[in-house]
Amino acid sequence: MKQLLISALLLSMASAGFAVNPKGGIDDAMLGRLRSSYKNDANDKAISNALKSNDINALAANVEAQNGLDENFTYRVKSKGITNQKSSGRCWLFTGLNVLRSQIMDQHDMPQIEFSQSYNFFFDQLEKSNLFLQAMIDTAKLPEDNETVQWLFAHPIQDGGQFTGIADNLSKYGIVPKSVMGETFSSSATTNLRKILSRRLREDGLRLREMAAKGAKESALMAEKEKMLQGVYRILTLTLGVPPTEFTWTQKDSKGNIVSTKTYTPQQFYKEFAGNDLKNDYVMFMNDPSREYYKVYEIDYDRHNYDGSNWKYINLPMEEIKKMAIESLKNGQMMYSSWDSGKFLNRQNGTASLDNYDYDSLFGTTFGMNKAERIRTKDSASTHAMTLCAVDLDANGQPVKWMVENSWGPVGDYNGHVVMTDDWMNEYLFRLVVNKKFVPADILKLQNQKPILLPAWDPLF
């Protein structure tokens, strides 16, 4: 039986285009050399005993790494309360709403307020469902093994996202206070909802392709798509609740005095209290050293709404990005930012430093890839959005450390914030969204370039 499995594996590798080198396996001689390479001396035994009983990070932790990291910052925009995305991938939505909340509370002298993430998530999932189904219609003439079609079926819907999704969502659907539409189990723990929607969409997508293959007209496909979206809408309503079309809300000032009581639609509420032109007033920047700087890139199919905008960004060196970040914080504006947050992040104390964990010493090896190499090999990519809110500068005006407002609840030594070294930021910041008024004119002109279109399955995305 084992021999049959091995033969089948070799056959599948050959059919996939991999030439099987008869010398490529681990033979007895090589295995002997590998065994001999492990010393198993007193030092190895001590490390092995410790690792068998403890988490790797607990033993690799560098207790001195936190030295110099504190809450003293040259420029800091105070947080308006720590939010908690819980077991969901909605960091992008929490971050976008947190940036907006900071501005609204300051401009309107409001007390504590939080906007409903569940409301905007409802429409995010509805829009993403439509994006997938319409893509199935648009690509119906392509063979099923086409790379785009395969990618669509592999990724019918996600709970994650990025800033252009926020811009399209809020501009179209507005916002509501959290008191109007609160969290549910499935908004706070999205895994099962995502699985149900993915299964529903894959089946519906296959049905649309079958209809198209039999010669169905576009009008018939569009009508069928709408019926399918009715099923999606029902699933979302049952799990997240009915999104309000209007609501009555009492505005108070920071002292608790009533300012007004009005009835709003979500769009009216957004226009009156936010009014931000998220689509046109903000620019997304990326630090991707694996690609040419000072160029504009666009990711195909990387949008939340079918009639929305693909993800576009200007690729810049970190020094350029940090200058704009400092200027924004100087002027009291938080920023949407995204990171490879899992690398060298100490969740217990809320710090991010390249010195937090010494894996090299623990395992007697080195991990030497630079940022570009990590991107190219899929070792590093943006995984989490957070709100950039503070920077500390040295005597020469150079950044030493930064702080972000996270959305994992009030945890760690900094009450839900993460303090990071400038070196860590250089390695693991990927995206920053900046208001145009803090972007130099020569950088802003780069937007006029024709974007370089990247496929949805690009290694970084």
Please provide the spans of the model-predicted regions.
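Bacterial Sec-dependent N-terminal signal peptides
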Residues: M1-P22
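N-terminal regions that are enriched for targeting/export leaders
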Residues: N21-G81
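Active-site signature of cysteine proteases
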Residues: N21-P22, G215-F461
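Post-signal peptide N-terminal segment of secreted/secretory-pathway proteins
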Residues: N67-T139
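Second-shell loop/turn segments in exported
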Residues: V77-G89, W151-I157, D307-N315, M324-A325, ...
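Stable alpha-helical elements in mature extracytoplasmic
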Residues: S87, T95-G96, L100, Q162-S171, ...
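Structural recognition of the beta-strand scaffold that forms the well-ordered cores
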Residues: L93, Y119-F122, D168, P177-V180, ...
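Papain-like cysteine protease catalytic cores
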Residues: Q117-T250
